Curated annotation (Swiss-Prot):
It comes from Danio rerio (Zebrafish). CDD domains: Bromo_brd7_like. The Bromo domain mediates interaction with histones that have acetylated lysine residues at specific positions. Also recognizes and binds histones that are butyrylated. Plays a role in chromatin remodeling and regulation of transcription. Acts as a chromatin reader that recognizes and binds acylated histones: binds histones that are acetylated and/or butyrylated. This is Bromodomain-containing protein 9. Keywords: Bromodomain, Chromatin regulator, Nucleus, Transcription, Transcription regulation. The record marks 199, 252 as: Histone H4K5ac H4K8ac and histone H4K5bu H4K8bu binding. The keyword NAD does not apply. Residues 1-26, 39-116, 571-631 are annotated as: Disordered. PROSITE patterns: BROMODOMAIN_2. GO terms for biological process: chromatin organization; regulation of transcription by RNA polymerase II. One of its GO terms (molecular function) is lysine-acetylated histone binding.
Length: 631
């Protein structure tokens, strides 16, 4: 390093020569404005009047001597001066930092500051450099110059943000971020504000649910978007409205389609995680040139003050030209949006549910894939499907899987010969056998139909044959002819005449006198199960009895009961006179006579025994066919 020389100042000679000639002058005031806020005032005309009042001639000579001595002394104390200068700079720096910290503590905290323009940054750097130079030369500055520095005015306090903005939830901040990105894509501001009929004629009649960026911003501030899917739905609605109102060849249609494509691609799950820079680079700005279109419709989001917008039209070839790759991405974005909407609907209507579908994996096993899985899950949620997931464990001692039938949908036989349903039917209809109940169920469908049919026939009982035929025709139409078929089958089983098939079930025998021929046989055993029809049976029987029997037939009618009574008396005497054995197993079997009169077989089944005891008039039998023919 070379020797440091002091700055050459020739003003000392000028002061010495012109001291007596120049009068005293008022110092000038120099004002420097930097950045519009700080003001530095320098006053001086090269000389100060107070300096010349106190200075004399001999002081100039004294000053020269001191200058020579100081030059020698400065060489010796060079390093000391450097240390002193360094120390003063550090003190000033600490003092400046302390003042800045005090002002920062008193000023309100600003959570967000905008970047300063380039011009302001250059001016601040220039101001700091000038200030540093003035401070470094403060000790060596000429004493004739008086420096007056005014304190800069305090910086105006910036209004703090509202409480609502400071208390925004992370969900709202994410939606605001998406909204800013979408508005940045809308370079011409087509979708910035709502559209009225003054801007677009007939817009309110065509579009029933309008949407724009300002409305979406208000909904974000009011926290009306509970999920990102709702935000996407409004964004899609806004673009769809523009494409519905405008023709496909207009710039607004193409801008809406392009914005819809880029917006869904930007708001996809991968873009939200990786960022826009990782998904796709910024698209180049399309070339703009004025063209004239045949349909000068106004924009969906066009301001009122713009009468002509032809200079903002794009070329049709460059506007929204979707290649195959971009078309696939657009479709993928729409599919993801639809999937998000479906997932939200499932979670809203069926919370905590697992809905999915079955598919086979590479190994051939069946898998259940869950559709509404946890959004935070990275992998697809699947569950293996096998017999263990569909059936319970084996019960000890059984070789088959336990299967529990659903009793709510259990189907049983309505009229089986060995179930409780048949017994119930027998208690309700004691005059019908299970086979006959099967016929009625097959004809009328169920128990309600059977009861309805019997109720109708009971209602018209005794009203004449015409009314009964009307009821039979009605039941035939209701059952498609099964009513008559069932009645005919029941008549055939009960050995009834075929001409009585159209009569009701409650009025089994016919009322017509011509229905009974002279040669027909009365089967009392088949009619014994109809106790409520005894009057009709007596009437029919009376018609046959009215005929006067011949003398021999009358004697035969009396001889047969007499013979039976005599046999009964003999059997009773034999039974009473015989001494029973002490051992019941040694009892003798019944004789042929006993078997002939008291029963056909000693070994009767349960059903046969019931038939034997159900009729108290067992011995009242119909006349023999031969005798009836003779009569």
């Amino acid at each position: 390093m070379g020797k440091k020389h002091k700055k050459y100042r020739p003003e000392w000679r000028a002061v010495e020569g012109d001291y007596e000639d120049k009068p005293l002058e008022k110092p000038l005031k120099l004002v420097l404005k930097v950045g519009g806020s700080e003001v530095t005032e320098l006053s001086g005309s090269g000389h100060d009047s107070s300096y010349y009042d106190d200075r004399s001639d001999h002081e100039w000579e004294r000053h020269k001597e001191k200058k020579k001595k100081k030059k020698k002394k400065s060489e010796k104390e060079k390093y000391a001066d450097d240390d002193e200068r360094r120390r003063r700079k550090e003190e000033k720096k600490k003092k400046r930092e302390r003042e800045q910290s005090e002002t920062a503590s008193t000023a309100p905290v600003e959570p967000f500051t905008l970047p300063k323009p380039v011009e302001v940054v250059v001016e601040e750097k220039k101001r700091k450099r000038d200030k540093f130079e003035s401070e470094s030369e403060a000790d060596e500055f000429h004493p004739a110059v008086k420096v007056e520095v005014e304190q800069p005015a305090d910086r105006p306090v910036r209004a703090c943000r509202t409480q609502q903005e400071n208390e925004a939830t992370p969900h709202q901040q994410l939606l605001e971020h998406f909204l800013r990105l979408l508005q940045r894509k809308d370079a011409h501001g087509f979708f910035a504000f709502p559209v009225t009929d003054a801007i677009a004629p007939g817009y309110s009649m065509i579009i029933k649910h309008p949407m724009d960026f300002s409305t979406m911003k208000d909904k974000i501030a009011a926290n009306e978007y509970k999920t990102i899917t709702e935000f996407k739905a409004d964004f899609k609605l806004m673009c769809d409205n523009a494409m519905v109102y405008n023709r496909p060849e207009t710039v607004y249609y193409k801008a809406a389609k392009k914005l819809l494509h880029t917006g869904f691609k930007m708001m996809s799950k991968q873009a939200a995680i990786l960022g826009d820079d990782d998904i796709a680079p910024e698209e180049p700005v399309t070339e703009m040139m004025p063209i004239h279109t045949e349909y000068p419709k106004k924009s969906k989001k066009q301001p009122v003050k713009e009468p002509i917008i032809s200079d903002m039209y794009e070329l049709e070839g460059n506007a929204c030209s979707l290649t195959d790759s971009t078309a696939e991405e657009h479709v993928l974005a729409l599919v993801e949006h639809a999937a998000d909407e479906a997932r939200d609907r499932i979670n809203r209507f069926m919370p905590n549910s697992k809905i999915g579908y079955l598919k086979k994996d590479t190994e051939g096993s069946l898998m259940y894939v869950v559709v509404n899985q946890d959004p935070e899950g990275e992998e697809e949620e699947t569950h293996p499907v096998d017999l263990s997931s569909l059936a319970n464990k084996l019960i000890p001692g059984l070789t088959s899987l336990g299967f529990k039938d659903d009793r709510r949908h259990k189907v049983t036989f309505l009229s089986s010969a060995y179930n409780t349903q048949t017994l119930q039917n027998n208690s309700i209809y004691p005059d019908l056998h299970p086979e006959e109940m099967d016929m009625l169920y097959s004809a009328y469908g169920d128990e309600t139909g059977v009861q309805c049919a019997l109720s109708l026939q009971e209602f018209v009982k005794g009203c004449g044959g015409f009314t009964k035929r009307l009821v039979d025709d009605l039941l035939d139409k209701m059952t498609a002819g099964d009513h008559s078929k069932a009645v005919v089958q029941i008549r055939q089983k009960r050995n009834l005449p075929i001409d009585e098939a159209k009569s009701s079930l409650c009025d089994m025998p016919g009322t017509d006198g011509g229905g009974m021929e002279a040669g027909s046989v009365l089967d009392f055993m088949s009619m014994k199960s109809y106790p409520d029809m005894s009057l009709d049976m007596l009437n029919t029987l009376g018609k046959c009895v009215k005929k006067e029997p011949e003398h021999e037939d009358g004697h035969q009618h009396f001889d047969d009961p007499t013979k039976l009574l005599q046999e009964f008396q003999d059997a009773s005497v034999d039974r009473v006179g015989s001494r029973p054995s002490s051992n019941l197993s040694s009892l003798s079997n019944a004789s042929e006579r006993d078997q002939h009169h008291l029963g056909s077989s000693p070994h009767l089944g349960v059903g046969d025994q019931a038939e034997m005891v159900q009729d108290p008039y067992e011995f009242l039998q119909s006349p023999e066919p031969g005798s009836t023919a003779n009569s």
